[in-house]
């Protein structure tokens, strides 16, 4: 992606992108997993207009807050983890345009002021799009666009510690962070995000630390980029994928197999 400028860039021949949804709780490592996939595919060094794989975050689609909502947000009293916090109409429209091979201007969001910025980021046509967010699977219309759904399953204590460190870097005090977590973040995860885990085709315990899972996913994205998309599309109709099982560490096969949803290893501790 690039900061918005001229959009009159010659488009590549239209080929419907392979859309991968990546969900999981706050600070579970979703964006880190996506970034590691990009790194292993060698896409970080490629010009943004020529990248075959791009990452898009659900965080960019937070609604514009009213003055009253923004005042509450600055006090840590607004629920950003609720489905109603997102502009699902804009999200749906943007993903549809991306699937149609269009060059798209995507909103930018300031997490310090809780504001949608006037600047946008340009997303150019790509072969594979990774869309990550805490509620990426919550809305059915959006969920059904994904041809592959990954759920990053990280221990709740680890997620909390990461959240504290991240929010303190954004200038928030510890008491506000913990109050927001217990009041909004944890209940919203249990009510809205965790139940969508059942829609995942692949569950990735421990996030980016689980390199067995990451390497297998990278391997199959390479298959897609090499034109061998049929490995993924067996059983896929109208953007929906059946539950599949990836080969385990001791397996030599490289195909995704239809069957139960993949859980690449047991979580060390349940949520």
From Swiss-Prot:
CDD domains: UMPK. Keywords: ATP-binding, Kinase, Nucleotide-binding, Transferase. The gene is uck1-b. It comes from Xenopus laevis (African clawed frog). This is Uridine-cytidine kinase 1-B. GO terms for biological process: CTP salvage; UMP salvage. Its EC number is 2.7.1.48. Substrate binds at residues 81, 109, 114, 163, 172, 180. Residues 240-271 are annotated as: Disordered. GO terms for molecular function: ATP binding; cytidine kinase activity; uridine kinase activity. It catalyses: uridine + ATP = UMP + ADP + H(+); cytidine + ATP = CMP + ADP + H(+). ATP binds at residues 24-32, 209. Residues 246-259 have a biased composition (Low complexity). Phosphorylates uridine and cytidine to uridine monophosphate and cytidine monophosphate. Does not phosphorylate deoxyribonucleosides or purine ribonucleosides. Can use ATP or GTP as a phosphate donor. It is an enzyme of class 2 (transferase). InterPro entries: P-loop_NTPase, PRK/URK, Uridine_kinase-like. Residues 262-271 have a biased composition (Basic and acidic residues). Pathway: Pyrimidine metabolism; CTP biosynthesis via salvage pathway; CTP from cytidine: step 1/3; Pyrimidine metabolism; UMP biosynthesis via salvage pathway; UMP from uridine: step 1/1. It holds the Pfam family PRK. The keyword Membrane does not apply. One of its GO terms (cellular component) is cytoplasm. Belongs to the uridine kinase family.
């Amino acid at each position: 992606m690039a900061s918005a400028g001229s959009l009159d860039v010659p488009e590549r021949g239209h080929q419907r992108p392979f859309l991968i949804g990546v969900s999981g709780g706050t600070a579970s490592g979703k964006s880190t997993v996506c970034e590691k996939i990009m790194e292993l595919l060698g896409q970080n060094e490629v010009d943004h207009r020529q990248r075959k794989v791009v990452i898009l975050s659900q965080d960019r689609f937070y609604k514009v807050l009213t003055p009253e909502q923004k005042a509450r947000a600055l006090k840590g009293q607004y629920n950003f983890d609720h489905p109603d916090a997102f502009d699902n109409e804009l999200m749906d429209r943007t993903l549809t345009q991306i699937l149609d091979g269009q060059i798209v201007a995507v909103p930018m969001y300031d997490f310090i002021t809780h504001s949608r910025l006037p600047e946008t980021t340009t997303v150019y046509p790509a072969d594979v799009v990774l869309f990550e967010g805490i509620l990426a699977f919550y809305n059915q219309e959006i969920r059904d666009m994904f041809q592959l759904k990954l759920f990053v399953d990280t221990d709740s204590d680890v997620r909390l510690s990461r959240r504290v460190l991240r929010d303190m870097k954004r200038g928030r005090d510890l008491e506000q962070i913990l109050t927001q977590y217990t009041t909004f973040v944890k209940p919203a995860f249990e009510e809205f995000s965790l139940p969508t885990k059942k829609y995942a085709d692949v569950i990735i315990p421990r996030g980016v630390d689980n390199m067995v899972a990451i390497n297998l996913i990278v391997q199959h994205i390479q298959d897609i980029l090499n034109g061998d998309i049929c490995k993924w599309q067996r059983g896929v109709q109208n953007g929906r994928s059946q539950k599949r099982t990836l080969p385990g560490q001791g397996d030599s096969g490289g195909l995704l197999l239809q069957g139960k949803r993949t859980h690449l290893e047991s979580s060390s501790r349940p949520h």
